[in-house]
Design a protein with these regions (language model features):
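Enzyme catalytic cores with a strong preference for nitrogen-chemistry domains
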Residues: 1-166, 177-188, 193, 198
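Short glycine/serine/threonine-rich phosphate/pyrophosphate-binding segments
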Residues: 173-176, 200-202
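ATP-dependent adenylate-handling ligase core
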Residues: 196-208
């Protein structure tokens, strides 16, 4: 009701290079990248706010990005946001694919960073020289890291001084405490045991 589809984007020129800028979901379907190629793009640079999901890295690199590169014959730099916003968490893991489908750069997940890439013009077009190849979090470490980043950024964005957790002695509250300490530091986490007459002694011991 509020927005209508605009025209397909055209490349921008930067230092003599025509760069296509498909934004986020523009690369999930072929039309935008194909149009950028047809209108003279030499390199694709795709800024993204792509939230974390299990196995999302494989889908981005080997699925969506690889398809657009194969279809257009253009290298693609995929730039993803890092951090949490409310219920969403963004894992970063930016990368560069060359026109032949090879991975030239893989940036780390969960860590905002700036990396200078080197490019050279070859007979078939531009190519990114090989560079950083960070190892991404394995599963299930990626899930834990997502919880830590999401909690950290939510608490800090809302300027909360810290968190208070009720401990039961069970594994669920123990995990919650571990996530909170890794996200905020022990000095910003206060754990409280709230026993009742039904609480077993072993639960009290585990909680303390």
């Amino acid at each position: 009701r509020l927005f209508a589809a605009g025209p397909l984007p055209t490349p921008i020129e930067f230092r003599g290079v025509r760069i296509g800028v498909p934004i986020c979901e523009d690369i999930w379907l072929p039309e935008v990248c194909a149009h950028l190629k047809a209108t003279g793009a030499e390199i694709l640079v795709s800024p993204n706010g792509s939230p974390y999901e299990i196995d999302k890295d494989d889908l981005r690199v080997g699925g969506v990005a690889a398809k657009r590169v194969a279809e257009t014959g253009l290298p693609l730099a995929y730039l993803n946001r890092v951090g949490g916003q409310d219920e969403l968490v963004f894992d970063g893991a930016s990368f560069v694919l060359n026109a032949d489908g090879t991975l030239a750069h893989q940036l780390p997940d969960w860590d905002a960073c700036v990396v200078a890439t080197q490019w050279e013009r070859r007979q078939g077009g531009w190519a990114c020289l090989p560079g950083a190849r960070a190892a991404l979090d394995p599963h299930p470490a990626d899930i834990y890291h997502a919880m830590v980043v999401g909690l950290r950024d939510y608490v800090n964005a809302n300027r909360f001084p810290g968190v208070v957790l009720g401990l039961s002695g069970g594994i669920d509250s123990a995990l919650s405490a571990a996530v909170a300490v890794d996200a905020l530091g022990a000095e910003r986490v206060r754990c409280v045991m709230l026993p009742s007459r039904y609480t077993a002694d072993i639960s009290l011991n585990d909680a303390t």
